[in-house]
Amino acid sequence: MNYFPWLTIIVVFPIFAGSLIFFLPHKGNRVIRWYTICICILELLLTTYAFCYHFQLDDPLIQLVEDYKWIDFFDFHWRLGIDGLSIGPILLTGFITTLATLAAWPITRDSRLFHFIMLAMYSGQIGSFSSRDLLLFFIMWELELIPVYLLLAMWGGKKRLYSATKFILYTAGGSVFLLMGVLGVALYGSNEPTLNFETLVNQSYPVVLEIIFYIGFFIAFAVKLPIIPLHTWLPDTHGEAHYSTCMLLAGILLKMGAYGLIRINMELLPHAHSIFSPWLMIIGTIQIIYAASTSLGQRNLKKRIAYSSVSHMGFIIIGISSLTDTGLNGALLQIISHGFIGAALFFLAGTTYDRIRLVYLDEMGGIAIPMPKMFTMFSSFSMASLALPGMSGFVAELIVFFGIITGQKYVLIPKILITFVMAIGMILTPIYSLSMSRQMFYGYKLFNAPKDSFFDSGPRELFLSISIFLPVIGIGIYPDFVLSLAVDKVEVILSNFFYR
């Protein structure tokens, strides 16, 4: 038991500091921006310090545990703790949120509310990744919905109300299933509700009941991840959201769905997961092909990148359903890798739109010459997205491939088929991402346009892009840095499938 409440401070600090924004003096937006960025940096440093000095990597058990009784009536605790599974997403959250706050620099309308919402989301995300109580996990999960809805509805594009409503309907619908699953698991087989993760891991259920719980949780996480056919909110949301919101959506929000699948569906309901994993494998494979093909037909730049995100999530689903150490490690690496690459692509798409005010690819063209820095950065991240060797996406997808091939659960012919179909998906990825670069940057369309609005990336944009590019290259060259965080925890999770 750790006596200093590190995790409580890390979870509560952003939303508490964010609420002080409303009391800052009215001296323009600059004060609010700098205040928010300082809070984000301070939070990231605090998190890094707590993890470096108080977290043992070789211990697969829950660490930094905090447990305070909250509501006595139904045994609800403020229970936090982290392990190898949650440390990567928490650090990714801190990094991407700090950069998204910097990306939101041009926003001037209702600046106080905007920055408060960003910090409230920060708390909700870290709370979701560090909860060790099912009801607390649900509350933190819900803390995400309203901020994203407001960010969409207030600072989005022309169709912002449509996409915000679609987002809230999908995610709130998923949350109903999540709540039903939480209540079902908590109330099963005892007079007192049990919400503690540690107790629930050792709980066993009748097969039919476990399958019902599994489906409830699965629908909630499938909406957030997203898994086809529950993905249609994502392209609309990305198409209308401000690019700083897109960074948070692509970098962190989708990863919460993947985290929930591993943390709850795999860890708490292993029998049902082993029954469903062949179907998940098929869904993941279809998703890679379907989303890559659909992406190719999109005129809207942001929607094309959104469909590429859906395609990349297919690798995470396949890694989770492979039931091997290698596959699950690959899925966790893909979670981190796509968090960086997706956020960077949306940021660059948004800054390009700020300059040329065009969103359809067939209207663009020829901007590589007036904007060479933008061209270089966008091309680099497109290469990272199509899994170029030496970048993080390549390592993650390769490890997922190995996970399928070495898996004991599946016979040879399905493994060969799935690997073959995944390979087709990986061939489609360069087609849509390179054609996107070609339509934007090559040709002569905009070359004759007036040069006033065509200024290249400024120091803020360069700093942001390089800050994301360094981890992408770093993980690509030395993936052990990320893999070592979770490798012991992955073994513990998978031991449930073979020794239970």
UniProtKB/Swiss-Prot annotation:
Primary subcellular site in the record, as a coarse category: plastid
Topology of this chain in the membrane: Multi-pass membrane protein
Keywords: Chloroplast, Membrane, NAD, NADP, Plastid, Plastoquinone, Quinone, Thylakoid, Translocase, Transmembrane, Transmembrane helix
Subcellular localization, as worded in the UniProt entry: Plastid, Chloroplast thylakoid membrane
Catalytic function, reaction form: a plastoquinone + NADH + (n+1) H(+)(in) = a plastoquinol + NAD(+) + n H(+)(out); a plastoquinone + NADPH + (n+1) H(+)(in) = a plastoquinol + NADP(+) + n H(+)(out)
Transmembrane portions of the chain: 4-24, 37-57, 87-107, 113-130, 134-154, 167-187, 208-228, 242-262, 272-292, 305-325, 330-350, 386-406, 411-431, 462-482
InterPro entries in the record: NADH_Q_OxRdtase_chain4 (IPR022997), NADH_Q_OxRdtase_chainM/4 (IPR010227), NADH_UbQ_OxRdtase (IPR003918), ND/Mrp_TM (IPR001750)
EC numbers: 7.1.1.-
GO molecular function: NADH dehydrogenase (ubiquinone) activity; ubiquinone binding
GO CC annotations, alphabetized: chloroplast thylakoid membrane
Record-stated family: Belongs to the complex I subunit 4 family.
Protein name: NAD(P)H-quinone oxidoreductase chain 4, chloroplastic
Native organism taxonomy: Eukaryota, Viridiplantae, Streptophyta, Embryophyta, Tracheophyta
